């Protein structure tokens, strides 16, 4: 079942609550919709230096990756575990979910290119650059001036690039199992 996409600027009401531009794009499991903040795409280019149509495609595919996790029951399982553990473990599980969504975005790019030959020269680099731009370390460094790895909820730039690339190169769901990986 495909998710519905909701485009917004500024703020939006979802089944998960009210969200402003500071949240950026997100997936709401309660209504199974992907919410895409159009202001974020300008920020991706202007603040993080990640531009191009494939940078935007990566972000959308990442959020749809969360919908895939919902369809597979992964989001629900992780949410149950997170309700029973402390913040450090919650954050670690969140990073695993986010990196898996990055991998699923790479898997989508692999399959789309294989079936439709859609990638142009430079597209993969745009996606990798976007993955790097939204790493917790880069965001923390730019907003706080320092990095606190224990506070990561999405993964470092290097991790996000690695998992997006892995999904793209392998192109299989099995390759995206961050929960059993030796190295995130």
Protein language model regions, located:
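Acidic helix-start/capping segments at beta-turn-to-alpha-helix junctions
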Residues: 1-17, 83-85, 122-128
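A mature extracytoplasmic/lumenal domain signature
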Residues: 9, 38-40, 72-73
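Active-site recognition of the HExxH zinc-binding catalytic motif
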Residues: 36, 55-71, 102, 106
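Short pre-active-site segment immediately N-terminal to the catalytic Zn-binding motif
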Residues: 40-59, 89-95
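Pan-zinc metallopeptidase signature
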Residues: 132-184
């Amino acid at each position: 079942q495909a998710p519905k996409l909701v485009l917004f600027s500024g703020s939006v009401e979802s089944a998960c609550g009210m969200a402003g531009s500071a949240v950026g794009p997100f997936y709401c499991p309660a209504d199974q919709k992907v919410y895409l903040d159009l202001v974020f795409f300008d920020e991706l280019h202007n603040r993080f230096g990640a531009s191009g149509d494939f940078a935007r495609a990566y972000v959308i595919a990442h959020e749809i990756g969360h919908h895939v996790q919902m369809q597979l029951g992964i989001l629900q399982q992780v949410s149950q575990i997170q309700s029973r553990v402390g913040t450090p473990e919650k954050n670690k599980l969140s990073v695993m979910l986010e990196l898996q969504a990055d991998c699923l975005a790479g898997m989508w790019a692999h399959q789309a290119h294989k079936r439709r030959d859609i990638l142009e020269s430079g597209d993969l680099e745009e996606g990798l650059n976007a993955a790097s731009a939204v790493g917790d370390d880069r965001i923390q460094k730019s907003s706080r001036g320092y990095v606190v790895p224990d506070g990561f909820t999405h993964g470092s730039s290097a991790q996000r690039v690695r998992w997006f690339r892995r999904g793209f190169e392998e192109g299989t769901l099995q390759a995206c199992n961050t929960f059993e990986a030796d190295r995130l």
